[in-house]
Regions:
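Acidic, contiguous internal or C-terminal segments within carbohydrate-active enzymes
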Residues: 10-27, 87-138, 278
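Extended, loop-rich substrate-binding clefts of extracytoplasmic carbohydrate-active enzymes
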Residues: 1, 52-110, 237-266, 270
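Solvent-exposed, conformationally flexible loop/turn segments
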Residues: 270-271, 303-305, 340-346
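A contiguous, surface-exposed recognition patch within enzymatic or periplasmic domains that forms
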Residues: 15-26, 32, 123-128, 132-273
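Surface beta-strand/loop "capping" patches
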Residues: 285-318
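Short, aromatic- and glycine-rich surface loops/edge beta-strands on solvent-exposed regions
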Residues: 323-324, 349-353
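Beta-strand-rich binding/interaction modules
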Residues: 306-337
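Short Pro-Gly-centered flexible turn/kink motifs
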Residues: 2-12, 73-75, 115, 267-282
Length: 353
């Protein structure tokens, strides 16, 4: 690639659609996104050439027609000491404009992703937006949807299944009716998409139990309405041979603004501007995710009949805070101390069986 921007541990390629190619959690060296060691286009995008890896910005159609074409960019120094790189273009189909701002703030481990979707025409136009976030996966990788997720659905909402354990055929595949824990990448024999049905919380995440690290995607679910994953599956060679040489399998954790499905177009009225904000960060050593915000991620897992894991990881340094586990009014566990992106709070706690 002839031109790239290195942005505090992140590599961004304006030359290839503004793709955020990789980002490293500097506390443990974990690649928050799937880092493809090669640029190896294949016939996937709307106009053909498409690469895997990092983050793809999909406006105003999925795998937009310019995802492999140079986009505009600008770096801004902000008054609080943060920096923002803006990426965007006037797209070819409707002559509408999109812009993505990636901001790194002093003392924060998250990337603040600001989106602007602008209809600068006098026409009512259809629009769809999804951030396509890829992560490295293997048999230890788990997709973490919010605990309130009861069902997942397919494209066009024409198949539904229970989550996380499926009990019905899904996308013409009968094996899902056999009690498959669909949160584990290894349990999907074929390529598939699963969308959260009726998103009620503000995050989608993935966790690698082998590397003890993961990726957290946070956004107001009233605006960031969509959450899904796409995978080629363990038996596919698309992601391991066609789209890369040696970088392995990946999964796509996608989050959609103003849309909860694909295709789920909404209308953009003449001269209307729509905006949204994400917060993305790496998590570590906490065994998964059950809840989270831009300030911290939390986990609670039952390890046995009488023990649970309690974990928390913050996005900034706190000299002292308190983590509590309660059952009704009863305090089962409390711990006070420092916490930071590099120092999560993780304990096992005895509970009644």
């Amino acid at each position: 690639c002839q031109f790239a921007l290195f942005f505090y541990g992140r590599k961004i390629l304006p030359e290839i659609g503004g793709r955020l190619l990789y980002a490293v959690d500097k506390t443990n060296g974990y690649d928050i996104f799937y880092r493809n060691s090669v640029v190896k286009p294949a016939n996937v995008g709307m106009t053909g050439a498409w690469i895997s890896g990092g983050v793809e910005w999909n406006a105003f159609h999925h795998h937009r027609q310019t995802s492999h074409i140079p986009c505009d960019w600008r770096i801004v120094d902000n008054r609080d000491g943060s920096k923002t790189i803006w990426l965007g273009e006037t797209e070819y189909r409707h002559r509408m404009q999109w812009a993505i701002g990636i901001t790194l703030r002093p003392g924060k481990s998250y990337m603040e992703i600001s989106g602007r979707l602008i209809n600068s025409t006098q026409n009512n136009n259809s629009m769809l937006y999804w951030s396509n976030v890829s992560t490295l996966v293997d048999e230890n990788y788990q997709i973490c949807f919010p605990q309130s997720t009861e069902f997942v659905t397919f494209h066009c909402k024409n198949w539904f299944a229970h989550w996380p354990v499926t009990h019905e055929p899904f996308n013409d595949m009968d094996f899902y009716k056999n009690g498959v824990d669909a949160s584990w990448w290894k349990n999907h024999y074929m390529s598939n998409s699963m969308f959260i049905h009726d998103q009620k919380e503000d995050f989608v995440a993935g966790y690698d139990h082998g590397r003890h690290a993961g990726t957290m995607l946070v956004g107001n679910h009233n605006i960031i309405k969509g959450g899904k994953f796409w995978l080629w599956g363990p038996n596919s060679e698309w992601d391991t041979r066609i789209l890369t040489d040696t970088s392995g399998h990946y999964c796509e954790l996608m989050v959609g603004a103003y849309s909860d499905n694909q295709p789920d177009y909404n209308w953009s009225f003449p001269y209307e501007s729509k905006e949204f904000t994400h917060y993305w960060y790496g998590i570590r050593d906490m065994g998964g995710v059950k809840a989270g915000s831009r300030h911290a991620a939390l986990n609670l897992d039952r390890l046995s009949s009488d023990r649970v894991l309690v974990g928390a990881n913050a996005t900034e340094k706190y000299a002292k805070l308190t983590l509590e586990l309660r059952h009704g009014d009863e305090v089962l566990y409390t711990r006070s101390g420092a916490m930071s992106p590099a120092e999560p709070m993780v304990d096992t706690v005895a509970v009644a069986s």
